[in-house]
């Protein structure tokens, strides 16, 4: 049980609420819009959830392994499992390999397209770990790694690409990229000292927050497009309105002079935003 707790801490399992709700939204849309009833529905649902868990374990495990020396020098992250000695770098890397294999095997059991795309998905979710060493756009790479979740969930059901899940992927990418900029404010000085790239390390705090707001404007615009293309239902519009309100609250709470609220804005509000939107959209899709 102690080992499970350590690895759950390694991958920040609680942060699964950022991407999983969007995958379930896309899965629901794929099912209700299918021209014929989806066979083995519960098996497909299980496969999608397993893929989400395995892919996230790969992403977070690889990130912690790749960055453990950097984390050890940062007072904010020195207590993480690898630099703190709770999990060895070798054990963490094996954890990544095992989850990557499990992910690929699971995609093979779904359909040919998910199987062929599985290496691409793994490459994307691992890319973020090194992007911060080269580009300030790493925030968007992180967003993309979460954004592929709704596309993958749709493909798992339908075996093809479609516009609506791709729009939702853009929603997730810009939403996540925006709140990651806010989160990165905590490491601004450290990143500058170490030569690491991030929006806050490159720009002033105020400019960084403006960029974050700009990305969230794109999020809301894409969300409105997404909602407009779905079956018109009051529940879906309520979900979009509440999601937008929570995003606005995030920027009210975090300003250049009020950075103490970063933890609440990053974890609590964004988790609430994704769960709220998914709940109302799924209800709307099922009752449309």
Whereabouts are the PLM-identified features?
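Extended hydrophobic alpha-helices typical of membrane-associated regions
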Residues: 2-5, 218, 225-288
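Helix-coil boundary and interhelical linker segments in multi-pass alpha-helical membrane proteins
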Residues: 27-50, 102-116, 150-170, 221-237, ...
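Multi-pass membrane catalytic core of lipid/isoprenoid biosynthesis enzymes
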Residues: 44-52, 68-118, 193-234, 273
């Amino acid at each position: 049980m102690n080992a499970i707790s350590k690895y759950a801490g390694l991958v920040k399992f609680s942060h699964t609420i950022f991407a999983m709700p969007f995958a379930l939204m896309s899965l629901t849309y794929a099912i209700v819009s299918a021209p014929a009833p989806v066979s083995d529905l519960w098996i497909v649902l299980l496969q999608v959830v397993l893929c989400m868990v395995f892919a996230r374990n790969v992403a977070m495990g690889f990130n912690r392994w790749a960055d453990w020396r950097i984390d050890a020098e940062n007072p904010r992250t020195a207590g993480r499992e690898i630099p703190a000695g709770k999990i060895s770098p070798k054990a963490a890397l094996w954890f990544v390999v095992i989850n990557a294999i499990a992910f690929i095997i699971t995609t093979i059991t779904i359909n040919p397209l998910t199987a062929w795309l599985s290496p691409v998905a793994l490459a994307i979710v691992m890319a973020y770990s090194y992007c911060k060493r080269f580009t300030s756009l790493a925030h968007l790479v992180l967003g993309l790694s979460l954004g592929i979740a709704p596309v993958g969930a749709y493909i798992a059901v339908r075996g093809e690409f479609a516009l609506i899940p791709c729009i939702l992927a853009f929603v997730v990418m810009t939403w996540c990229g925006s709140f990651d900029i806010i989160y990165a404010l905590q490491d601004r000085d450290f990143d500058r000292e170490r030569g690491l790239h991030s929006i806050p390390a490159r720009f002033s705090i105020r400019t960084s927050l403006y960029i974050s707001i700009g990305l969230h404007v794109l999020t809301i615009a894409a969300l409105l497009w997404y909602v407009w293309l779905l079956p018109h239902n009051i529940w879906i519009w309520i979900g979009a309105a509440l999601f937008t309100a929570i995003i606005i609250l995030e920027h009210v709470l975090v300003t250049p002079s009020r950075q103490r609220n970063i933890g609440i804005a990053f974890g609590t509000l964004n988790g609430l935003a994704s769960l709220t939107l998914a709940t109302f959209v799924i209800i709307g899709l099922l009752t449309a």
